[in-house]
Structure formats: C-alpha cells, structure tokens
Amino acid sequence: MSKLDYGFNIPALKVMKLKEIQTPCLLSDYETFKINVEKMRSFTHENNIKLRPHAKMHKSVEVAKYQLQYGNASGICCQKLSEAEVFVSSGIKDILITNQITDL
C-alpha cells in the first residue's frame, strides 16, 4: 500500500442509514450528475471553449475521470500538491495547482 492509498473504498448505498456510511463520503444523485456533465459538455462545445473543473468539491478520482471523458474537460484543477499526487497516481496528467507552492 502506498501513501496515496487511504482505504476509503466502501460504497454508500441508498439502503444504508447515515450512521453506517464511512466518512468522508461523496454522496451524489448519479443521474443528475450525468445530466449536469452533459450540459457543461454541450455548452463548452457549442461555444468552442474548454472546461477545467476544480476537484476541490468532490476530491474524487472517479468523478474527475468522468468529467475528463464525458465533459469536454481539458484537465482538472486542485488546491494542493498532495491532491495532485493522488490524481497523477491514478493516471490523470493534465493538472493545474491553483495555489502557490512554497517551501514553508
């Protein structure tokens, strides 16, 4: 196990009680999520622009990969180098770190 493997791989199911869900956990209506990604893909395609979604809301490799594959995204943004490391280790290569990196 590398330092990037955190072990949070237990999916939350609709039948689970809130106290049974391992946290932190991203909960989303998958159909609405897909519709929103498609709307952004259509908008960016029609206006000849690229989207670079920020991963700070979801912090999810799976969501970022979906946005890249289906959402006309040119890459992703994240806040910190440690977040970028997780995305790079999962195969995402086009990442913009939106904060300054210092040696402090």
Q: Which positions does each model-derived feature cover?
A:
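N-terminal hydrophobic targeting/anchoring segments and the immediately downstream early-domain regions
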Residues: 1-7
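Serine/threonine-rich low-complexity intrinsically disordered regions
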Residues: 2, 17, 70-72
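N-terminal glycine-rich anion-binding loops that anchor highly charged ligand groups
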Residues: 8-13, 32-65
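Generic N-terminal amphipathic, Lys/Arg-enriched alpha-helix
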Residues: 9-28
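Bulky hydrophobic/aromatic packing residues
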Residues: 14-18, 43, 74
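A generic short-segment signal for beta-strand/edge and adjacent turn/coil regions
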Residues: 20-23, 44-46, 64-66, 92
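Active-site mouth loops of central-metabolism enzymes
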Residues: 22-30, 50-54, 70-76
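Active-site-proximal beta-alpha core segment in soluble small-molecule metabolic enzymes
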Residues: 54-104
